[in-house]
């Protein structure tokens, strides 16, 4: 299984309940498509290098996972692009 890290930035004005629901939803998208989540944690609220959608700060969330194929990653990528609460995301394959 290949190891991946996903970092995504959530809009800073989201309510805590909505943020937890968003994280749970995207974690379940990964697991329902065959990935195994090793760790999913909030990093911190950070100032952005440049303004994104009129926001100067964002809530960073990191997910470490293992996957045998790209199905889960492609579905995460597709859904995070159309979700208004996620400002940016990045998927990186880690060295084994």
Curated annotation (Swiss-Prot):
For this protein, the record's Pfam families field holds: Ribosomal_S6 (PF01250)
Query: Which CDD domains does its entry note?
Result: bS6
GO biological processes:
translation
Tell me where the signal peptide lies.
none
**Which InterPro entries does the UniProt entry name for this protein?**
Ribosomal_bS6, Ribosomal_bS6_sf, Ribosomal_S6_plastid/chlpt, Transl_elong_EF1B/ribsomal_bS6
- Which domain of life does this protein belong to? Bacteria
| Coiled coil start-end | none
The keyword Phosphoprotein is assigned to this record: no
Q: Which GO terms describe its molecular function?
A: small ribosomal subunit rRNA binding; structural constituent of ribosome
Q: Which UniProt keywords apply?
A: Ribonucleoprotein, Ribosomal protein, RNA-binding, rRNA-binding
| GO cellular component, as recorded | cytoplasm; ribonucleoprotein complex; ribosome
The entry's function note states: Binds together with bS18 to 16S ribosomal RNA.
Family under the similarity heading: Belongs to the bacterial ribosomal protein bS6 family.
What protein is this chain from? Answer: Small ribosomal subunit protein bS6
Organism (species): Streptococcus equi subsp. zooepidemicus (strain MGCS10565)
Query: Organism classification, top ranks?
Result: Bacteria, Bacillati, Bacillota, Bacilli, Lactobacillales
Gene that encodes the chain = rpsF
